[in-house]
Amino acid sequence: MSMKRKKIVIGIVVFVVLATVSLLIANTIAKNKLKDYIVNLPEHITIVYDDLDVSLLQGNITLKAPLLTVKGKTTNQVNAQVKLANLDIKGFGYWSYLFNDKLKFEALNFETPLVTYYHNPLADTDQGSQSVLKNIKKALYIKNLNVNEASVKVINVENDSIIFSTNNLNFLMTQISINDDLDIKTLFKFKSSTVSANNLKYQV
């Protein structure tokens, strides 16, 4: 092998090694930033999960077996819980997040979520919804939000009765955005939505 060819081979090897190391470092930085964001949610909102997978090249993130719990700010009682098989995020805009502090996703997929909401007639549910979304504290854009095969149960806390339930619920919402331009009464904007479900039960 000639000296010129050796230099070319060495240069290629060095480039591949540097690119791989840089990718691993960037991947670790992005993963740690996401972990910090989850840890630093408001006290009444918690997310626990089994594992967090990040693929920088594909822009994909998977939270394995996450459990979201939302409590009342004053009562400290559980208002809602969402348990999923997986939360899959596709096409995450890392550079928008790292440098512009903006959350941007091509798709957000909730796989087989089990949703339990504890309805309190005396509570201000609209205020609670605003609290969760406003606490995101970042500009947010989601091209497609998919909920696949969800089970939903709404429980009346006054008598522990089930006032609403359904299973195999599928939901799609497109072009969702949250930013500082929205007025206080508007939680978010979206373009379209579709929903289907089985075994819908409602207590009048």
Please name every model-derived segment.
Residues 2-43:
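N-terminal type II signal-anchor transmembrane helix
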Residues 30-40, 124-125, 129-136:
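Sec-dependent signal peptide cleavage junction
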Residues 47-122, 131-158, 174-203:
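Flexible beta-edge/linker motif
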